């Protein structure tokens, strides 16, 4: 028991119940002005949700806050989505049972680690098509891709050559720090033609192990985002129809997709941050050298 200033004792349970009752009395009905302010926000949330059905409240809040410039709290977005049944529920049956034996590589600068993989997509009137992507693990930008009706070594090399021409127009051998390409142990990346091409391009290969589910996690996560945003909500009859929408999606992903791991920056914003940082360092070096010569 606790004794108050009058000498009366009060047990802890009674004190706890009184506190709960006081909190309940303090809760008031939301004002009409506040409710009116929620209307345009809810309209915008529903519009974003219609375009991206599997986006959660954090990503929707980040898009509204950092891409559209709306000053809004994360809890407010969570409340509005919860009141209108717009939240994404977790499927506990899909929880992974494997555990990684070692951590995945962490990229600290662009072009340090690239990830490459393939996924297949079924078209209703055509059959299977194969999507190959190359991802920069630092900026999360898709820098190379190729869509085909097969998944041969040449298809993989086409996507890889696009990535090289995007980031190294003058060739990798003329740049410092050659990228490391992370792939699985499939027949395409382990073929002699692919290994020889990587050696000629100046790319070092890293192969994931069978007992390391996080070995190429960043690249596989991009395919999940692709299927959530584009594949599962649309249907195509012919490959070229998918190709057009896929290229539009890649442009939107690189320029307009906020990433939590990038402090809600887009991939191209993250790349521009490193470019500005390098330019600032070079300017400082030039100033120091000019002062020494003077």
Where do the PLM segments sit?
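Mobile genetic element proteins and their domesticated derivatives, centered on retroelements
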Residues: 1, 5, 45, 60, ...
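Alpha-helical structural signal in soluble globular domains
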Residues: 63, 80-84, 163, 193, ...
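RNase H-like polynucleotidyl transferase catalytic core
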Residues: 91-95, 178-185, 199-218, 234-239
């Amino acid at each position: 028991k606790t004794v108050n200033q009058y000498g009366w004792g009060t047990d802890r349970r009674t004190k706890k119940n009184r506190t709960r009752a006081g909190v309940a009395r303090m809760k008031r009905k939301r004002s009409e002005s506040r409710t009116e302010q929620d209307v345009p926000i809810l309209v915008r949330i529903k519009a974003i949700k219609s375009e991206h059905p599997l986006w959660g409240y954090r990503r929707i809040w980040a898009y509204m806050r950092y891409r559209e410039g709306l000053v809004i709290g994360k809890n407010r977005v969570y409340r509005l989505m919860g009141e209108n049944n717009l939240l994404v529920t977790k499927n506990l049956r899909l929880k992974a049972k494997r555990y990684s034996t070692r951590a995945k590589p962490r990229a600290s600068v662009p072009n340090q680690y690239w990830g490459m993989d393939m996924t297949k997509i079924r078209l209703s009137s055509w059959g299977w098509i194969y999507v190959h992507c190359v991802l920069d693990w630092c900026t999360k930008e898709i820098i190379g891709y190729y869509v085909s009706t097969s998944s041969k070594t040449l298809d993989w090399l086409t996507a890889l050559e696009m990535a090289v021409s995007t980031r190294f127009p003058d060739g990798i051998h003329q740049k410092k720090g050659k990228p490391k390409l992370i792939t699985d142990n499939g027949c395409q990346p382990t073929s002699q033609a692919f290994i020889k091409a990587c050696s000629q391009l100046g790319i070092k290969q890293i192969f994931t192990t069978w007992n390391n589910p996080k070995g190429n996690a960043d690249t596989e996560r991009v395919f999940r985002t692709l299927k959530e945003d584009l594949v599962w909500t649309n249907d195509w009859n012919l490959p070229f129809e998918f190709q057009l929408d896929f290229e539009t999606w890649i442009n939107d992903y690189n320029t307009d997709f906020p990433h939590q791991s990038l402090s809600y920056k887009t991939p191209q914003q993250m790349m521009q941050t490193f470019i500005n940082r390098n330019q600032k360092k070079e300017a400082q070096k030039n100033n120091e050298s000019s002062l020494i010569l003077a």
